[in-house]
């Protein structure tokens, strides 16, 4: 079966003990980026709460969780603090696992000796051919998707 899947879907399939390979295209990877933006009208206690959340989000725990799904944290050094040496080697350095590699929920994803598809962070990010954003036709596509789901 060939399927277009995002990293969390691949994590879910592998955590069920099923073989699943993330096959890169010869043209390169497609990548997405996400971030935070505050309206200039955000003031006072609301701004304080937003900054507290953003600081927590970038402090490492969330980044490690995302890394364990196959995504990448915006702040790699803080995420590294929440990962074992073996996890970091597997997810970020393209090294063979020394022991079991677990999903964010604790399910087994890989065994000793296995390597992550696509290699290291540098290999994968160095092979990005297209950066995606929300497409102009996003609202149309979401509307059509919802119509299909409702039918």
Which residues make up each language-model segment?
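Ligand-binding pocket segment of bilobal, Venus flytrap-like solute-binding proteins
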Residues: 1-23
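Soluble non-cytosolic domains of exported or imported proteins
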Residues: 4, 44-48, 132-139
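Solvent-exposed loop/turn segments at secondary-structure junctions
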Residues: 7-11, 28-30, 43-44, 60-61
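Solvent-exposed, polar/charged alpha-helical surfaces in well-ordered, non-transmembrane soluble domains
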Residues: 11, 51-55, 64, 139, ...
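Periplasmic-binding protein-like
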Residues: 17-40
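Mature extracytoplasmic/periplasmic domains
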Residues: 39-116
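Conserved C-terminal helix/tail region of periplasmic/extracytoplasmic solute-binding proteins
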Residues: 107-151
């Amino acid at each position: 079966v060939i399927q277009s899947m995002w990293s969390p879907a691949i994590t879910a399939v592998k955590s069920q003990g099923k073989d699943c390979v993330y096959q890169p295209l010869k043209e390169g990877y497609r990548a997405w980026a996400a971030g935070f933006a505050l309206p200039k009208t955000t003031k006072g206690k609301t701004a304080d709460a937003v900054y507290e959340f953003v600081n927590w989000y970038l402090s490492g725990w969330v980044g490690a969780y995302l890394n364990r799904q196959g995504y990448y944290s915006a702040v790699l050094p803080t995420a590294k603090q929440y990962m074992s040496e073996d996890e970091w080697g597997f997810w970020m350095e393209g090294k063979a696992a020394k022991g079991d590699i677990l999903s964010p929920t604790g399910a087994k994803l890989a065994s000793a000796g296995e390597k992550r598809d696509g290699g290291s962070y540098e290999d994968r990010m160095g092979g990005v051919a297209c950066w995606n954003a929300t497409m102009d036709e996003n609202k149309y596509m979401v509307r059509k998707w919802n119509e299909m789901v409702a039918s």
